[in-house]
Amino acid sequence: MTMKNVQAFTDGSCLGNPGPGGWAAVLRCNGSERELSGGFALTTNNRMEILAVIEALALLKEPCGVDLYTDSQYVRNAVEKKWLAGWRRNGWKTSDKKPVKNRDLWERLQPLLDLHQVRFHWVRGHSGHPENERCDVLARTQASSRGLPPDTGYRE
């Protein structure tokens, strides 16, 4: 049985950093498209970037080949440059022995990366890439919403 191939486009936004934030993803598979987004009252841009990837991958109910497009060097580098593996190996400490930021989200992301075959593609933000621009609009709309829930994992 062959694995489904999915295109996932993700973005995170924060109005202030920290401040109200939003995340968004657009997924495409076999000619169909799905948009998803959410937000939090107080969070950071990096948390929203990671969460967008988590939510996109979590939507997939079976192992898939995923071409994931992000404008976040932070997320891409954490995976591709093996920072994530190093942090786990070092007891969630950075190379200078400080606690890894956003550990709660990295721990949610890892099993999804193990399940799917994810290929990261970096796109320049705000450069006219249609899907990245769409995700940006969705994420900013969420960040601007009233009555957002707290980001319980955020620590100042």
UniProtKB/Swiss-Prot annotation:
Keyword Transmembrane: no
One Gene Ontology term of the molecular function aspect: RNA-DNA hybrid ribonuclease activity
Enzyme Commission (EC) number: 3.1.26.4
Binding residues for Mg(2+) 1: D11, E49, D71
Swiss-Prot/TrEMBL keywords: Cytoplasm, Endonuclease, Hydrolase, Magnesium, Metal-binding, Nuclease
Primary role: Endonuclease that specifically degrades the RNA of RNA-DNA hybrids.
Family membership: Belongs to the RNase H family.
Name of the protein this chain belongs to: Ribonuclease H
Protein source organism: Nitratidesulfovibrio vulgaris (strain DSM 19637 / Miyazaki F) (Desulfovibrio vulgaris)
Higher taxonomy: Bacteria, Pseudomonadati, Thermodesulfobacteriota, Desulfovibrionia, Desulfovibrionales
